[in-house]
Amino acid sequence: GVGFKAGVKDYRLTHYTPDYETKDTDILAAFRMTPQPGVPAAEAGAAVAAESSTGTWTTVWTDGLTSLDRYKGRCYEIEPVPGEENQFIAYVAYPPDLSEEGSVTNMFTSIVGNVFGFKALRALRLEDSRIPPAYSKTFMGPPHGIQVERDKLNKYGRPLLGCTIKPKLGLSAKNYGRAVYECLRGGLDFTKDDENVNSQPFMRWRDRFLFVAEALFKSQAETGEIKGHYSNATAGTCEEMLKRAVFARELGVPIVMHDYLTGGFTANTSLAFYCWDNGLLLHIHRAMHAVIDRQKNHGIHFRVLAKALRMSSGDHIHSGTVVGKLEGERDITLGFVDLLRDDYIEKDRSRGIYFTQDWVSMPGVLPVASGGIHVWHMPALTEIFGDDSVLQFGGGTLGHPWGNAPGAVANRVAPEACVQARNEGRDLAREGNETIREAAKWSP
């Protein structure tokens, strides 16, 4: 007789294991799935586990040459989503051997590579993942981390302040450098290349880096503070990207920048290793994230992309602002902000955290609040993000009616006033605007 029966097999038989006890070394994932009508939840969950690990749609001879029990993904729990008719959270455990060490690229190729186009599912979203220390320890993590960055910059006890230079496209390198100088001279810690600024015909990267470095050193000499500009090293090839990072280091600037989703995890980690070896801070922008994380029932939640960045490496990452959005968003945003900054984060479903995450000793990433913020948001931002964050303005600096430098002064005075008021025990939610009005009287 033949060894096994051909034909399409039920995934449930092998990949749905409700009695499985998860191991400390397992990579865990929580998927929000919307099965097609008529597909049972257990079958859909098992299909997700199978297709993102060892399974295929039929039994194959070569299955006998390995131990599937050791390598297969297991759907170990399914819970209906309250208030949704046909939605479930499927919990899947993967053995760590399925992912190459130190490769976010390979981890994602496994867990979210194929399965999102799966016919039996109407939609699928990766809501959260648990990275075990056994696996996270194979990653370098951020090149410096929060504490080392503060030590390098000699800035303590307050959020760091930045400003994206606008108009983002069209300025010449010389004028761009001038805007950088005015902002830094006014009191900001950092200025930033917009994520779209790479090396376009109106401003080639080398010219921009040079004029920006000049602005940095001039403003440093005049203020006695350490200044930085996120020079965007993102490029069309890894070699070109590293060439730009090398040039930045040769100029003696403290920080470079990368778009980690459009540039890709592989390029990002290569750049991070260079930064680690050469003492450069690495600022990460998340251009393209909304393509992946904006849909509520399909895609990947940003908290997973944030965890992936902490492993792939970066010292700063953009993480939304909360301000002016809904209250519910606040807890969710703070959930992944803590996943970026802290060592140990407890499971807390109200903040969207499905698993307890222990980063052990991996350095933290500074969350960057950017997008439409200005001085009147300061009390709220100080309260929400605390000291370990970067507050990133744009129009909120350069839109000041008196010019860029006064805009930067205002940006610096407001958070310092808020931090002082908070430290004196005043309630920022109630007295914040008053605090800023008071401070403005003494601001030049």
Curated annotation (Swiss-Prot):
It catalyses: 2 (2R)-3-phosphoglycerate + 2 H(+) = D-ribulose 1,5-bisphosphate + CO2 + H2O; D-ribulose 1,5-bisphosphate + O2 = 2-phosphoglycolate + (2R)-3-phosphoglycerate + 2 H(+). The modification N6-carboxylysine is found at K192. GO terms for biological process: photorespiration; reductive pentose-phosphate cycle. Binds 1 Mg(2+) ion per subunit. It comes from the Eukaryota. The record marks K325 as: Transition state stabilizer. The modification N6,N6,N6-trimethyllysine is found at K5. Signal peptide: none annotated. GO terms for cellular component: chloroplast. Its cofactor is Mg(2+). The disulfide bond which can form in the large chain dimeric partners within the hexadecamer appears to be associated with oxidative stress and protein turnover. Keywords: Calvin cycle, Carbon dioxide fixation, Chloroplast, Disulfide bond, Lyase, Magnesium, Metal-binding, Methylation, Monooxygenase, Oxidoreductase, Photorespiration, Photosynthesis, Plastid. It is found in: Plastid, Chloroplast. CDD domains: RuBisCO_large_I. The active site is at K166 (proton acceptor), H285 (proton acceptor). Mg(2+) binds at K192, D194, E195. Substrate binds at N114, T164, K168, R286, H318, S370. Its EC number is 4.1.1.39. The keyword Transmembrane helix does not apply. GO terms for molecular function: magnesium ion binding; monooxygenase activity; ribulose-bisphosphate carboxylase activity. Heterohexadecamer of 8 large chains and 8 small chains; disulfide-linked. The disulfide link is formed within the large subunit homodimers. NCBIfam families: PRK04208.1. RuBisCO catalyzes two reactions: the carboxylation of D-ribulose 1,5-bisphosphate, the primary event in carbon dioxide fixation, as well as the oxidative fragmentation of the pentose substrate in the photorespiration process. Both reactions occur simultaneously and in competition at the same active site. Belongs to the RuBisCO large chain family. Type I subfamily. The basic functional RuBisCO is composed of a large chain homodimer in a 'head-to-tail' conformation. In form I RuBisCO this homodimer is arranged in a barrel-like tetramer with the small subunits forming a tetrameric 'cap' on each end of the 'barrel'. This is Ribulose bisphosphate carboxylase large chain. It comes from Botrychium strictum.
